């Protein structure tokens, strides 16, 4: 049998804990029973003005060098909702996320896109768990549901963020406003069939 060097796919070791493993097993059993069209996955990720490609081409034996801002760069946060056929409620904020800014996002951007019967799926970040967030989602006739801990593989929006960051690194935007404009342009790079593929890759049935 031939072998070759292969990039590792890394998972959190905590997934092997009995309590986490049980919750993940229950979740996976639930996945096949829910209509993917009802699922709305929301999350946030950082974007920065010092992003650059992580890989490139160089002559064998030569180091590949690149320049990025060292002391003058900004961190912003991108939030969005992934449905089976589209990205909904995209938003960028200046700086890191906190409870107040996440609630404002839910109330002002997410809730207007929700329909009765929608299931809003989130990870276990503290800002996601407030009663105010629950009540805002409930006001639209939707429900809030938390993923098992240490389970980004069960959240298809993580695939969106991975592709988005790859494209942003290639863009090398160095001001906040150019970064935000570029994010808006790149959202067109996620057509309905690709969103459906992200769902299937994470185990959420046929769409």
Specify the residue positions occupied by each region the protein language model found.
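Short functional hotspots at interaction and active-site rims
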Residues: 1-207
């Amino acid at each position: 049998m031939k072998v070759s060097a292969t990039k590792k796919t890394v998972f959190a070791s905590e997934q092997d804990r009995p309590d986490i493993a049980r919750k993940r097993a229950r979740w996976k059993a639930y996945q096949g029973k829910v209509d993917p069209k009802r699922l709305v996955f929301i999350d946030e990720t950082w974007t920065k003005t010092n992003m650059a490609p992580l890989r490139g081409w160089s002559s064998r034996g030569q180091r590949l060098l690149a320049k990025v801002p060292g002391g003058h760069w900004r961190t912003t946060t991108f939030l969005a909702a992934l449905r089976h056929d589209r990205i909904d409620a995209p938003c960028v904020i200046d700086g890191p996320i906190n409870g107040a800014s996440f609630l404002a996002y839910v109330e002002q951007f997410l809730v207007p896109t929700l329909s009765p019967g929608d299931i809003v799926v989130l990870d276990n970040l503290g800002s996601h768990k407030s009663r105010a967030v629950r009540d805002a989602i409930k006001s639209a006739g939707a429900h809030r549901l938390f993923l098992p801990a240490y389970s980004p593989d069960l959240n298809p929006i993580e695939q969106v963020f991975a592709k988005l960051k790859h494209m942003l690194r290639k863009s090398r935007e160095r001001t906040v406003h150019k970064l935000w404009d570029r994010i808006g342009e790149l959202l067109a790079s996620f057509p309905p069939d690709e969103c459906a593929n992200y769902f299937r890759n994470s185990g959420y049935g046929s769409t």
